[in-house]
Amino acid sequence: MLGVEPLLREEATEAAVKQVKSPFILHIATHGLFETTTNPKDPTIDKDSLLRSSLVLAGVKEEKIDGDNGLLTALEATGLNLLGTELVVLSACDTGVGGISPGEGVYGLRRAFAIAGAQSQIISLWKVDDQGTKDLMVKYYQRLLDGNIGRTEALRQTQLEMLRGQAGEKYTHPYFWASFIPSGNWLPIPPRQK
């Protein structure tokens, strides 16, 4: 089902991610950032809300001539070509948070990837543990790629397995599994069209 084309370590640059065209599934495992507002009592939307959520990519500390700084902001993510993309998994900290707009919801990476065309997303609501997240994702994909289970149900079953200690006692605390939530299409991933 998956024709994986990994971008690993120094290959996972902002420019390389921006060139990805309509992948069936896009999985980004990196660091996520969210800059809070200067007034935490007023988390409402501001003109820069889509600039406050970002993913850290390779070369973030290097000076760039082309304008890419190694941070893929939510605003930049809206310009990705994700039409036909069934699922985006943002396996990083704070990928589900953003500026809040009354009547509109959260402006952040989830909204950005939906605007770009992704049918569904798996996002996180707080800082996550690297090893626990890796183990959760491996089990999630094992269930998901079976083909008989929906995207949300695959995540739910994986989280229950961790809660019950079936993935190891160290993962029973919600910190390790409850951060990840689904958004969008909850149905099984359809067979990939050739």
Which ranges hold each PLM region?
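Catalytic cores of enzymes
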Residues: 1-194
